[in-house]
């Protein structure tokens, strides 16, 4: 188990998880607010 946690903390795995979370967040924001350029405050 120690080797597995060491693998999960390596830079490519952490970068992949970070990019995946960021992409998912952007996709969901764009799903609920499709075009923020048309918001008139």
UniProtKB/Swiss-Prot annotation:
Cystine pairings recorded for this chain: none
GO BP terms: photosynthesis
Keyword flag Magnesium: no
Residues that span the membrane, as ranges: 7-27
SUPFAM superfamilies (alphabetical): Subunit IX of photosystem I reaction centre, PsaJ (SSF81544)
The keyword Membrane is assigned to this record: yes
Entry's localization field: Plastid, Chloroplast thylakoid membrane
Topology in the lipid bilayer: Single-pass membrane protein
Assigned GO CC terms: chloroplast thylakoid membrane; photosystem I
Domain of life of the source: Eukaryota
Keywords per UniProt: Chloroplast, Membrane, Photosynthesis, Photosystem I, Plastid, Thylakoid, Transmembrane, Transmembrane helix
Family membership noted in the UniProt record: Belongs to the PsaJ family.
Protein role: May help in the organization of the PsaE and PsaF subunits.
Name of the protein described by the UniProt record: Photosystem I reaction center subunit IX
Species for this entry: Oedogonium cardiacum
């Amino acid at each position: 188990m120690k080797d597995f946690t060491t693998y999960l903390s390596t830079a490519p795995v952490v970068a992949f998880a970070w990019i995946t979370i960021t992409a998912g967040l952007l996709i969901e924001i764009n799903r609920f607010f499709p075009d923020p350029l048309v918001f008139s405050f």
